[in-house]
């Protein structure tokens, strides 16, 4: 996959292709991921948020709502956002939470609204040329010293259309540069699944605080 700049129409089309993929596989995606153990990610995210719960949380790229269900069950005020109409429908049904249907490239987020933004396996679909703008929008929607959690598949800074999804695979240093440039301070990072050799840990999880 090549890292080449996309013009506006190409960006829109890559986004549409990715969303159409999730619309097609929405039910299978729910049944295939609903029992995944991401408790390590929940703990890393919630432990970094300052103050006393319950917290105001945005699940960015919430998919079919597994994580919405968890945060809601813990008493937090959680809102979801996803670009796929089919996934949004399932997420609302599963969680009972408010879920916004918004394309990542055209979000409309309130300012200074959330204690934390949980972006589990979602931001890697944002083309790198748009990532600074998207991260700034996330920064703006967080309250002072709010927390951003991200988990993305890692790689050697390749990006492009992978099958029917646009994907970016950053290494740690490159991902750090993007998020730090948006104004965030790194809290910590880790690789998943835990307990395996690094070459068998394809996921990079990072926790950030609004600077």
PLM region spans:
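Class I SAM-dependent methyltransferase SAM/SAH-binding core
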Residues: 58, 64-106
